[in-house]
């Protein structure tokens, strides 16, 4: 959903690298090369960006305050 601000394992700040990571992928960098360019060398930090799924835009389409009609 929302990009984690810190790595769950080591605590390094990674939230500010998400947009740059996406830009590098759009520029035809390989995932590993993009992470190297960002300075992410630990496996735990690399995992945080590689496995993140950005679902926030899809979830904003649902209205949680809307009541469904039981009939």
UniProtKB/Swiss-Prot annotation:
Database matches in NCBIfam families: PRK04016.1
Q: Name one GO molecular function term.
A: DNA-directed RNA polymerase activity
Quaternary state and interactors: Interacts with IYO.
SUPFAM superfamilies the record matches: RNA polymerase subunit RPB10 (SSF46924)
Know the name of this protein? DNA-directed RNA polymerase subunit 10-like protein
Coiled-coil stretches: none
Q: Write out the GO cellular component annotations.
A: RNA polymerase II, core complex
Q: Name one Pfam family in it.
A: RNA_pol_N
| GO BP term, example | DNA-templated transcription
Q: Which residues bind Zn(2+)?
A: 7, 10, 44-45
What InterPro entries does the annotation carry? RNA_pol_su_RPB10, RNA_pol_suN_Zn-BS, RPABC5/Rpb10
């Amino acid at each position: 959903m929302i990009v984690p601000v810190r790595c769950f394992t080591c605590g390094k700040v990674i939230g500010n690298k998400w947009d740059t990571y996406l830009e590098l992928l759009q520029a035809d960098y390989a995932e590993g090369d993009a992470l190297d360019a960002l300075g992410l060398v630990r496996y735990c930090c690399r995992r945080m960006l590689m496995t993140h799924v950005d679902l926030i835009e899809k979830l904003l389409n649902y209205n949680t305050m809307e009541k469904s009609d039981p009939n």
